[in-house]
Amino acid sequence: QLTFTPNWGT
């Protein structure tokens, strides 16, 4: 499973 953390979701 890949966990993606968007930086443009602040």
UniProtKB/Swiss-Prot annotation:
The keyword Glycoprotein applies. The modification Pyrrolidone carboxylic acid is found at Q1. The keyword Glycoprotein applies. GO terms for biological process: neuropeptide signaling pathway. Keywords: Amidation, Glycoprotein, Hormone, Neuropeptide, Pyrrolidone carboxylic acid, Secreted. Glycans are attached at W8. The modification Threonine amide is found at T10. The glycosylated tryptophan appears to be identical to the C-linked mannose found in mammals, but lacks the typical W-X-X-W motif. The carbohydrate moiety is not necessary for hypertrehalosaemic activity. GO terms for cellular component: extracellular region. It is found in: Secreted. GO terms for molecular function: hormone activity. Belongs to the AKH/HRTH/RPCH family. Hypertrehalosaemic factors are neuropeptides that elevate the level of trehalose in the hemolymph (trehalose is the major carbohydrate in the hemolymph of insects). This is Hypertrehalosaemic factor 2. It comes from Carausius morosus. The lineage of its organism: Eukaryota, Metazoa, Ecdysozoa, Arthropoda, Hexapoda.
